[in-house]
Amino acid sequence: MAIFTLTSELHDEKAVASATWDFLKSLRQASTTEWMGEDPYLFMGNDYTEYGTHAIDIIYVRTGGTEGIFKGMLPELSKKSKRPFYLLTSGKSNSLAASMEILSFLRQQGIKGEIIHGKADFIARRIDTLAKVGKARRELNGTQLGIIGKPSDWLIASDVDREKVKETLGISLIDIPMQELLDVMATIPLREVDENPTEENIKKALPGANQIYDALKVIIERHHLQGFTIRCFDLLTAVHNTGCLALARLNAEGIVAGCEGDIPTMLTMKIAQSLVGVTGFQANPSAIDPETGELLFAHCTIPFNMVERYEYDTHFESGIGVGIRGYMKEGPVTIFKTSGDLSRHFIAQGNLVRNQALPGLCRTQQVIQLEDPAIANYFLNDPIGNHHVILPGHHAPLIQSFIEQP
């Protein structure tokens, strides 16, 4: 993250510089984010040549009397970046007053901005959040996500606005025929597996499940994909197997791998991965208690890097192939979903209170207690499709900041 400065010539530069280093030092000390030993703050001073090229660019309004200077710089800065202007203030030398005048001017021009002001720990947290959001948006820009086969027929409310996705996120959606995957599978021999499950039907299905994984790796490399969603139920009839094992592995390897050709959920998973480092558990709400806010989510696959342990079972609906029953660590979780046109978002925090393995449901089952029970009404009154993404940890403020920052 880069720190640029705005300073009036009327102020003594030596005194202002000393106060600047003390202020930035307090922010570094207050930051709780790990930046791999690097100084998170890149001090650029009054050289704005590289403005707009970092995960986040912050203008430190060091003194009053800078309003006119900023107004003169605005046309050039607006060419360099279309993101909001972030004005950092220290509370000294009329810094806050000048920032308020600048922000008011920006609002009059229809330009977004924010004043970052408060105690050192608050400022550090806000800057860390904005930096993570900026880093995520840079990572998403240029991403290619595949749609292998068409969305499943039952996903009647899961259309996507491809132009909006490209414009807003920088993500390109690539259509890949299911037959291409099947053709690749035909060239890949079955291989022995290390696992030795006791159930004979699962033991017989594992080589085929691994073949699906190997073929998907070929498709990913061929089309330069960072993720995909697959019309996985077609595999049941085409090869008498399932993609659950392959998706669990690929998600753990950092490749977004979604089920049922659900494009909005794939986008949700990719956004989540860019922000928190995991793709998430794509799942259906299977039961809801609107009075207590307790929800049951279930699906037949979950990323291996999200669970403490897992078991093999058959795929629930078909009773064939290899499904995954994963057990995630109990504790804080976030439920997230974005719509296909990116106009709506759902974010809720809760706690995973137990994993279960009841018959009659998809194999991985999670019971989640919402922090706010009233939010359960969203699922019954105004849901964004059926699939939602479960993330370990509480991330609502970070995700909300991503949504609010263009």
Show which residues each predicted segment covers.
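Short hydrophobic beta-strand segments
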Residues: 1-15, 59, 141-150, 381-392
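N-terminal basic/disordered segments at the start of proteins
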Residues: 1-44, 401
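Short, surface-exposed alpha-helical segments at coil->helix boundaries
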Residues: 17-21, 25, 96-103, 158-163
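Cofactor- and metal-binding active-site motifs of prokaryotic enzymes
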Residues: 30, 38-141, 151-154, 158, ...
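Flexible, glycine/charged-enriched surface loops at secondary-structure junctions
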Residues: 36-38, 176, 231, 278-286
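Conserved, well-structured core segments that form the ligand-binding/active-site neighborhood
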Residues: 103-276
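C-terminal catalytic subdomain
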Residues: 255-357
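Extended hydrophobic packing segments that form well-structured cores
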Residues: 323-406
